[in-house]
Design a protein with these regions (language model features):
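Cytosolic covalent-transfer regions centered on His/Cys nucleophiles
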Residues: 1-154
Length: 154
């Protein structure tokens, strides 16, 4: 059974038109936003995210990035999504700036969870139709519903 995005992303963790000048400022801002929900300090969150980014950018191309890391002491998987205005350089694989960022924080002990979460988010964000709509929506509720909608079975 594939992981659903709504199992780790709540409507209150959708942020539209976040403005940060660069990747490090952006990750720090997202860590500050996530910290109260997960019971970790923003410093701990950003340190692990930066360690992961040093292994290779989590910018997957097409203006989308999925920064993620695993944390000891985290009780359950957590997601946060931000649409950026303006887009920032994320050293993505296609060298295009990023304007849709999906932050994933995963418990260290949850072996397969983070791969399932990454797969769920990448499948959804790979749809050009979905990402184009996410770039234009002004209502957080509709943004959340589009992001968490289960793809139709054919």
């Amino acid at each position: 059974m594939p992981t659903s995005i709504s199992s780790f992303l709540s409507p209150s963790d959708v942020f539209l038109d976040v403005g940060e000048p660069d990747k490090i400022s952006l990750l720090s801002d997202l860590a500050r936003r996530a910290a109260p929900s997960v019971g970790l300090s923003s410093d701990v969150i950003v340190t692990e995210l930066m360690k992961r980014e040093r292994l290779g950018s989590t910018g997957m191309g097409g203006g989308v990035a999925i920064p993620h890391a695993r944390y000891t002491g985290l009780k359950k998987p957590f997601g946060l999504v931000a649409r950026l205005k303006p887009a920032v350089d994320f050293e993505a694989i296609d060298n295009m700036p990023v304007d849709l960022v999906f932050l994933l924080l995963v418990p260290a002990a949850a072996e397969g969870d983070h791969l399932n979460m990454l797969a769920a988010v990448s499948r959804r964000m790979r749809s050009r139709e979905v990402t184009q709509k996410l770039r234009t929506l002004q209502d957080k509720t509709i943004f959340y519903k589009l992001l968490t909608a289960e793809p139709e079975k054919h």
